[in-house]
Amino acid sequence: MSFSVDVLAGIAIELQSGIGHQDRFQRLITTLRQVLECDASALLRYEGRQFIPLAIDGLAQDVLGRRFTLEGHPRLEAIARAGDVVRFPADSDLPDPYDGLIPDQESLKVHACIGLPLFAGQTLIGALTLDGMEPDQFDVFSDEELRLIAALAAGALSNALLIEQLESQNMLPGSSASFEQVKETQMIGLSPNMMQLKKEIEIVAGSDLNVLISGETGTGKELVAKAIHEGSPRAVNPLVYLNCAALPESVAESELFGHVKGAFTGAISNRSGKFEMADNGTLFLDEIGELSLALQAKLLRVLQYGDIQRVGDDRSLRVDVRVLAATNRDLREEVLAGRFRADLFHRLSVFPLSVPPLRERGEDVVLLAGYFCEQCRLRLGLSRVVLSPGARSHLLSYGWPGNVRELEHAIHRAVVLARATRAGDEVVLEAQHFALQEEVSPALPDDSTPTLPANHNLRDATEAFQREMIRRALAQNNHNWAACARALETDVANLHRLAKRLGLKS
């Protein structure tokens, strides 16, 4: 069989008729699967010694969330090194990265596999993979015909990457486009609200505006901050992180602004604060709502005038720092309650971003699950970790109050459990490996009274009451310990100690 001019023209037309890069990539993959009569096809982007799926057809949806490292996938490494069409024999001892990931064929191993590396000049930018269940499925196609397919795909991918770079170049004066500069963050998701968030990040990244990132605990606010920094002119300089909720009041000012020798007991030498460390770069202040009003006033001065004073020093230091702040609280409500300065809120929220909770991201749950499955596979040295159809449905039906962080932990626990109950280095996650309903205690009604143990003495009753109060406060505050401490009107450090004594923390 050979390709007719009409077939090649049809592929080219599909590439031009798509709306946006993602649609064009999907049209290409779907058309190739039909023309080549393969069971699965994928277009992958190459970056940082790993392949990142851009479009798939005939593969499980979670493949789009996986990141295939060369070290962990010898077939993909062979494709990256080859420079030409790669045909893997049916009896190849190199594991196929898609084994177990073709729907309705999970228990079967892929037999026929072809890899087409994609180049822009001499630079590897991606690959096309074609897989079939029959050993001789692709024998009818010559290498020359497959090279034509690769050339069409490479042209589409290189144009998309170049446009992406030119768009970034417009926002970053002085930059120049090159394929080596393309960098993909780990913000996985194709749901409409995640695509909107990514678009907003692209808009604000090239500016020097301060950004307030809001969202529930575990949604990935730190990843948003990293994406903003990496897309900014400051990307060559440091991104410095500070968790405001973990700062004791006694050292918070020193952590932010530094101190000089002798400023207080224990200050045995000069020490730079986070603002100095982030000079010409970016400072990410996580849980900004936990700062005291006194520190908020000093932070406001830095944002207004660009100078800081180390603790114990009368001199001012000039700093050039972009501030990204994150919170899981409604700072507007905090302003009304007098717990957060209105002027600081307005300084920080010039360009506010809201990170959607996982329950509002639809199929992104499956993509993220694939990403975490691949992480576990590499970490535990397994040949494959896949989700059964039942497991996918189970994950999609759950509400994820702990968001992406809870999903990550759930996948890791499920892999360990499944591995312990099945011999070998292949793990298939089933619905029963996830005890999701038991992982998060439902919030009690506000007017409920904690149940006391029967035949209790005073100590048991007191501990039972404390335990239930803490559980209720945690559930009502998205399992954020600092917010829980505020709700219970107690010190967060004391709350941690009490929770450990009551068996609520390990």
Swiss-Prot record:
Q: Which domain of life is it from?
A: Bacteria
> What are the alphabetically sorted keywords of the record?
ATP-binding, DNA-binding, Nucleotide-binding, Phosphoprotein, Transcription, Transcription regulation
DNA-binding region extent: 481-500
Q: Which residues carry this modification: 4-aspartylphosphate?
A: D57
Give the signal peptide range.
none
* Keyword Phosphoprotein listed: yes
The GO annotation for biological process reads: phosphorelay signal transduction system
Binding-site residues for ATP, renumbered to this chain: 215-222, 278-287
Q: Which residue range or ranges hold the Sigma-54 factor interaction domain?
A: 187-416
Pfam families (UniProt xref): GAF, Sigma54_activat
Q: In which pathway does it act?
A: Nitrogen metabolism; nitric oxide reduction
GO MF? ATP binding; ATP hydrolysis activity; DNA binding; DNA-binding transcription factor activity
Q: Which NCBIfam families match?
A: PRK05022.1
The role this protein plays is:
Required for the expression of anaerobic nitric oxide (NO) reductase, acts as a transcriptional activator for at least the norVW operon. Activation also requires sigma-54.
Which protein are we looking at? Anaerobic nitric oxide reductase transcription regulator NorR
